[in-house]
Amino acid sequence: MQKIFDAHLHLWDLGKIPISWIKDDEKLEQNYDFFRMKQEYKEFEFIGAMYVEVNSDDLEKEALFALEQKKLHNLLFCLADFKHKEELSSFREVMHVSKKGAKRLFEVDFEEKIEILKTFNIPFEACMKNEEL
């Protein structure tokens, strides 16, 4: 059986995490939980996943949800918040939602984040649109 590690897994429970950007999209405006995902991979030997933040409206609620998923399902996780940096496998910032787009990379607080990432040896994922590259 083919082994699979999902390196970019989004999960959400709309009762726990507010996510306004999925409103009015019937395919997205529903819960996507770990067991639903496991069903999608039933033809594979699932060996793990990296939970990636979903750009929710409440980073703290999402961090708590992600921590719960990590403990329940032994997931790695990538968040956009340093509050739980000792638990992070990776850090993510969604650039295309910033008014400055990729220019966000040159702001002082972003440089400070990079220093924290270097100190704690945490990989970084930038999410941006192709035209911003």
Residue map of PLM features:
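An N-terminally biased module of ancient metal coordination in phosphate/nucleic-acid-related enzymes
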Residues: 1-68
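Active-site gating/metal-coordination segments in enzymes
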Residues: 57-132
